[in-house]
Regions:
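Short, small-residue-biased leader/transition segments that mark boundaries at the very start
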Residues: 1-5
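Active-site environment of divalent metal-dependent phosphoester hydrolases
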Residues: 16-21, 42-47, 61-66, 88-93, ...
Length: 176
């Protein structure tokens, strides 16, 4: 996909049957950002019309084999690798996910599964978990999704609540 900088994307994950919040986020951002991603465990059918215009992968709770296990999306010169994470054993190690991201030469690797919002860098790649939009785990009991803004110099990760309020404590910036 041809995109000029800055590039902005929306990332959500682990909605676990809550179709309405996926629709809400899609309506709010479609046409205003360069891409929308869902990192799996929607528990919706892969043929659901909500997925039109959304990059979506299969999670461990998605029994519909119509979803891909992983995607690689190129927006301008930015390579985004996307997966749920369970097949890479992320509960135990980052090694397999990291190896795949390196093989794809990914600038950003999106994952879900853990229901914990996180953004961190290893080597070239910035790893982003948007948290769960429905069932958060870990110390932050907030249902979240992420907005990522990429420009020449930086990758900025912002987290938002279901009410689309910025959860500023989690904002991070990474050098490109």
């Amino acid at each position: 996909q041809t995109c000029a900088l800055p590039i902005s994307i929306i990332v959500m994950s682990d909605s676990h049957g809550e179709r309405d919040i996926v629709v809400d986020i899609k309506k709010r951002y479609q046409g205003k950002v360069d891409a929308i991603f869902h990192n799996g465990d929607s528990e919706l059918e892969s043929s659901d019309s909500v997925w039109e215009g959304i990059h979506v992968v299969r999670g461990n709770c998605d029994y519909d084999s119509g979803y891909p296990e992983r995607l690689v999306v190129k927006l301008g010169d930015v390579i985004i690798a996307q997966t749920h994470g369970h097949l890479f054993g992320i509960n135990f190690t980052w090694d397999k996910l990291d190896l795949w991201a390196q093989q794809e030469d990914a600038d950003i690797c999106l994952y879900g599964h853990l229901h914990v919002a996180a953004a961190w860098r290893n080597g070239k790649t910035v790893y982003i978990n948007p948290g769960s939009i429905s069932q958060p785990r870990g110390p932050i009991h907030e249902k979240l999704y992420a907005k990522v803004i990429i420009n020449d110099a930086k990758i900025r990760v912002e987290y938002y609540t279901r009410d689309h309020e910025l959860y500023s404590e989690l904002t991070q910036e990474f050098e490109r």
